[in-house]
C-alpha cells in the first residue's frame, strides 16, 4: 500500500463519504426543488420547462434528463417520443412524482436509481413541445449516429445477434430481446452485453496499434487512442463501467506517453475518486460495485493467487499441449479470482447465482476479442456499404450464434440458478475480512519466496500445495458464513402490494404464500412478490393458497405461474390450493392452465382440511364442502388458522357477510389477525373481534386509494378491542416473528415486541 498511495487515498475517501452519509450529511442527494414537492405528493399534472441534457432509449419508453428552467435541480422525463433533441429547450406536461425507497425487501430501489442520475423527481409525460431546438450539439450528434449504427446492424444481422452486438459495441440494451437478456443472465454472461472495461480496452489498444501501423509516433498514437476512447465513451453513454474504463485507459495511455509504468490498481483508485467526487451516490449503485469489483479481482486478487507471472509459468514448456494446458489453468485462475469477489456482490444485489457459468465464460473469453474486433470492423464497413458489412460480420454472426446456443443450453440445466438470498451486512463484512486476510498472507509469502528463491526451491511444491489447500478450506467456511440463512420458527409477512393482499408464512423449511395480487401496482408478482422471495433466499414455495379469485388477490400468483412455466425464474411451487367451491367453475381455468404448464399440482381446500409442517398446523375453517359462493366470492374466501406452539394467527382473505358468520363459531382466540377485505367497514365485525381478540392486526391496502381503505369504522372497532394496528401504507412490508415466548413486529416505521398470551 505504501507503493500505491492512490489506493490508500481512495479507501480513505470512501470511508469519509460513508461516515458522512451515516451521519446524515446529504452527499450525493439531488437538489429537491420545493415548487415540485407538493405537486409530487399529490400526483398532480404540471407543465415543466427546461433543457434536455442527456437521452437514453428504454424498452418501453424514452428517458431524458431535464434541467428545469430557473432551477438548480434536474428532473427525469419519461416520454413516448424519442426525437426530442439533446440541448433543446422543451415544455412538457405530465404527472410529477418523487422516487420512493423500496417498501418491500428486495424491491427495486427507485430512489437510489434516480439519485444516480442526479434527479430528485421524475415526470411521466403526456405532451411535449420543443420551444427551441438549439444550436448544433455534440451530444445530439452522437445520439443520432448511435441510432444510425443500431439501424445498420439490424439490416446486416438477425434481430437477436444485432441486439447483442448493439449492446456490446454501442451500449444499447434496448435492442435486446427479453429471451436473450434472460439467457445471458442465467448463464452468468450479463457482463458481456454491455460496454465493459475489457471491451473498451480491446478497442482502444486496437486503435493504438492501427495508428502506430500508420507510422504515427508511439506517444502521439497513445494520446490519440486515449482521446478516441473518451469520444467513444461519450458516444455510447457515460455509464458507470464506461466512465471507469475510460479513465483507466486514459491513465494507461498517459503512462505510455510519459514513459512511466502503468499500475491498474492505482488507475482504478483514481477513477473511483473522480467518480465519487462528482457523485457520492455511486456508493449505493450496484453498477459501481460490480464494475470496480471485477477489475479489483483481475488486478488485485488474480496476481496473488496466480503466484508467478504467466510468462514465468510457461518458461520451458515445449509442446503446444503444455501451452494449452497452461492457458486453461490461467483462465481457470482468472475465473476463480473473479468469483471470489463477484459472488458476494451478486448475492447482495441479485439474490441468486448462476452455478454453471464457468464453461460459457471460458468460451466467451476465448472468442470475445474476435467478436468485438470483427464486429467493430463490420459496423464501420456497414456504414459505407451494408453488403460489405454483412460479409465482414459473418464470423461475428457465427460466434454470437454459438454463444447464444450455449447460453440457451446452460439456461435449460435444472438447478442452473441458485436463489441464495441477500446476506446480512455482518456476513458481507466477515467474508471480506477473511478473503482480504488470506490474500495478505499469500502475498507476504509470495514476496518472501521471490526474495529468497533458493529457500523456496528447497521447500518445493508441497508447501505451495498446502497453502492452496488451506486457502480453499478457509474460503469454503467463508462461503458457509456468507450463505448461512437461519430458519424462522414462525413468521408472517404482509407484503406491500398496494391495493391487494400477499402474505408469506415461514416455519422452519416450510414456506406458504397466501394470496398474491394487486389492483393498483403493475406486475406485482414479478416486481414485488418474487424479489421478496429471492431476497429471503426462498427457492421453493411448499404451498400457494388462493383464498378467492379476485384479481387483487391472484394476478401476482398467475404471474409467478407464468414465469415458472416459461422457465424465466428458478423459483419452484410444489402445491397450488384453490377453494373447493371453485372446482369445475370457469374461474379456476386460468389457474389450472398456468399450473399445468408449470408442472404444479392443483388441490382444493375445504373446512376441516389441515396442512402440517413441523410445529406448524394450518387448519382450514372455511369454506365448507358443497357450498357455492359464485357471485359472492368474498364470502367464500378460504380462512386459515395457523398454530405454532402457543401462537395462533387467522388469515381471512376478503371474508365478509355470511362467510364471516360461519367462521365465527369455529375461530379461536388469535394473537395475529390479517384483517379481511383491506380494512373495509363491511368486514371484521365487533362480534368477530370479540371472539378473536387479536393483539396484532395487519391491514394490506393502498393509501390514498379509490376505496378509502382502511375505513374509519373498522379502525375504531380494532382500537376498541385494544389491538395494535399495522398497515402496509404506513409501515411498508410488515413481518410478525415468533421469538420464543414473544412476538416481534418489524416494519419500516415500527419495531415492537409483544408477549404471547
Protein language model features and the residues they cover:
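Aromatic-rich juxtamembrane segments at the membrane interface
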Residues: 116-248, 253, 337-340, 543-545, ...
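Cap/insert and terminal regions of metallo-dependent hydrolase folds
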Residues: 575, 660-732
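Hydrophobic alpha-helical transmembrane segments in multi-pass membrane proteins
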Residues: 8-20, 179-358, 374, 421-487, ...
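Core dinuclear metal-dependent hydrolase active-site scaffold
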Residues: 173, 276-284, 408-543, 596-672, ...
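Metallo-beta-lactamase
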Residues: 541-552, 581, 673-677
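Membrane-interface helix/helix-cap signal primarily in integral membrane proteins
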Residues: 13-191, 526-531, 540, 581, ...
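Active-site HxH/HxHxD metal-binding segment of metal-dependent hydrolases
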Residues: 551-596, 694
Amino acid at each position: 500500500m505504501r507503493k500505491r498511495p492512490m489506493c490508500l487515498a481512495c479507501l480513505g475517501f470512501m470511508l469519509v463519504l460513508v461516515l458522512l452519509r451515516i451521519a446524515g450529511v446529504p452527499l450525493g442527494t439531488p437538489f429537491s426543488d420545493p415548487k415540485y414537492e407538493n405537486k409530487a405528493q399529490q400526483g398532480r399534472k404540471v407543465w415543466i420547462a427546461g433543457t434536455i441534457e442527456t437521452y437514453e432509449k428504454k424498452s418501453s419508453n424514452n428517458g431524458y434528463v431535464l434541467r428545469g428552467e430557473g432551477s438548480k435541480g434536474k428532473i427525469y422525463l419519461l416520454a413516448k417520443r424519442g426525437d426530442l433533441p439533446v440541448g433543446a429547450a422543451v415544455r412538457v406536461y405530465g404527472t410529477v412524482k418523487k422516487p420512493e425507497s423500496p417498501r418491500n425487501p428486495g424491491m427495486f430501489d427507485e430512489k437510489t436509481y434516480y439519485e444516480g442520475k442526479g434527479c430528485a423527481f421524475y415526470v411521466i409525460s403526456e405532451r411535449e413541445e420543443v420551444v427551441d431546438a438549439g444550436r448544433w450539439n455534440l451530444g445530439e450528434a452522437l445520439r443520432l449516429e448511435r441510432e444510425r449504427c443500431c439501424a445498420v446492424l439490424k439490416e446486416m444481422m438477425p434481430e437477436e445477434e444485432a441486439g447483442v452486438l448493439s449492446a456490446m459495441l454501442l451500449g444499447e440494451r434496448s435492442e435486446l430481446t427479453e429471451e436473450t437478456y434472460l439467457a445471458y443472465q442465467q448463464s452468468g454472461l450479463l457482463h458481456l452485453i454491455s460496454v465493459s472495461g475489457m471491451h473498451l480496452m480491446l478497442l482502444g489498444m486496437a486503435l493504438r496499434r492501427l495508428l502506430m501501423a500508420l507510422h504515427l509516433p508511439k506517444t502521439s498514437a497513445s494520446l490519440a487512442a486515449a482521446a478516441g476512447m473518451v469520444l467513444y465513451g461519450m458516444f455510447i453513454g457515460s455509464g458507470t463501467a464506461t466512465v471507469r474504463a475510460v479513465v483507466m485507459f486514459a491513465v494507461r495511455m498517459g503512462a505510455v506517453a510519459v514513459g512511466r509504468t502503468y499500475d491498474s490498481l492505482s488507475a482504478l483508485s483514481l477513477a473511483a475518486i473522480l467518480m465519487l467526487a462528482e457523485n457520492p451516490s455511486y456508493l449505493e449503485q450496484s453498477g459501481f460495485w460490480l464494475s470496480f469489483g471485477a477489475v479489483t479481482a483481475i488486478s488485485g486478487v488474480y496476481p496473488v493467487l496466480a503466484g508467478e507471472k504467466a510468462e514465468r509459468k510457461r518458461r520451458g514448456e515445449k509442446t503446444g499441449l503444455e501451452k494449452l494446458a497452461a492457458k486453461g489453468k490461467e483462465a481457470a485462475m482468472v475465473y476463480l479470482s473473479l468469483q471470489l469477489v463477484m459472488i458476494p456482490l451478486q448475492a447482495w444485489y441479485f439474490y441468486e447465482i448462476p452455478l454453471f457459468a464457468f464453461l460459457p465464460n471460458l468460451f466467451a473469453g476465448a472468442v470475445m476479442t474476435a467478436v468485438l474486433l470483427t464486429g467493430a470492423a463490420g459496423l464501420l464497413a456497414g456504414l459505407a456499404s451494408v453488403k460489405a458489412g454483412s460479409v465482414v460480420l459473418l464470423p461475428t454472426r457465427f460466434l454470437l450464434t454459438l454463444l447464444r446456443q450455449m447460453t440457451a443450453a446452460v439456461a435449460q440445466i435444472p438447478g442452473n440458478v441458485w436463489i441464495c438470498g441477500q446476506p446480512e451486512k455482518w456476513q458481507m463484512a466477515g467474508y471480506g475480512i477473511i478473503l482480504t486476510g488470506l490474500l495478505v498472507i499469500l502475498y507476504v509469502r509470495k514476496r518472501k519466496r521471490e526474495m529468497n528463491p533458493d529457500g523456496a526451491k528447497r521447500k518445493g511444491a508441497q508447501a505451495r500445495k498446502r497453502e492452496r489447500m488451506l486457502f480453499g478450506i478457509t474460503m469454503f467456511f467463508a462461503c458457509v458464513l456468507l450463505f448461512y440463512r437461519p430458519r424462522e420458527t414462525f413468521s408472517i409477512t404482509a407484503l406491500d402490494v398496494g391495493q391487494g393482499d400477499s402474505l408469506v408464512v415461514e416455519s422452519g423449511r416450510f414456506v406458504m404464500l397466501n394470496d398474491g395480487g394487486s389492483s393498483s401496482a403493475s406486475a406485482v408478482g414479478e416486481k414485488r412478490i418474487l424479489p421478496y422471495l429471492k431476497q429471503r433466499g426462498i427457492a421453493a414455495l411448499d404451498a400457494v393458497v388462493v383464498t378467492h379469485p379476485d384479481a387483487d388477490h391472484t394476478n401476482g400468483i398467475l404471474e409467478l405461474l407464468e414465469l415458472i412455466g416459461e422457465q424465466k425464474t428458478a423459483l419452484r411451487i410444489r402445491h397450488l390450493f384453490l377453494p373447493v367451491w371453485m372446482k369445475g367453475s370457469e374461474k379456476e381455468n386460468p389457474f389450472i392452465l398456468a399450473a399445468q404448464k408449470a408442472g404444479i399440482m392443483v388441490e382444493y381446500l375445504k373446512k376441516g382440511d389441515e396442512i402440517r409442517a413441523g410445529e406448524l398446523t394450518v387448519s382450514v375453517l372455511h369454506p365448507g364442502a358443497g357450498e357455492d359462493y359464485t357471485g359472492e366470492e368474498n364470502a367464500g374466501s378460504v380462512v386459515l388458522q395457523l398454530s405454532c406452539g402457543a401462537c395462533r394467527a387467522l388469515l381471512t382473505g376478503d371474508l365478509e357477510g355470511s362467510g364471516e358468520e360461519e367462521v365465527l363459531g369455529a375461530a379461536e382466540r388469535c394473537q395475529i389477525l390479517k384483517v379481511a377485505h383491506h380494512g373495509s367497514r363491511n368486514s371484521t365485525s365487533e362480534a368477530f373481534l370479540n371472539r378473536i381478540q387479536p393483539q396484532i392486526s395487519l391491514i394490506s391496502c393502498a393509501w390514498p386509494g379509490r376505496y378509502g381503505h382502511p375505513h374509519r369504522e373498522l379502525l375504531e372497532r380494532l382500537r376498541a378491542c385494544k389491538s395494535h394496528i399495522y398497515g402496509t401504507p404506513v409501515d411498508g412490508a410488515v413481518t410478525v416473528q415468533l421469538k420464543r415466548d414473544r412476538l416481534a413486529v418489524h416494519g419500516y416505521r415500527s419495531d415492537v415486541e409483544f408477549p404471547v398470551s
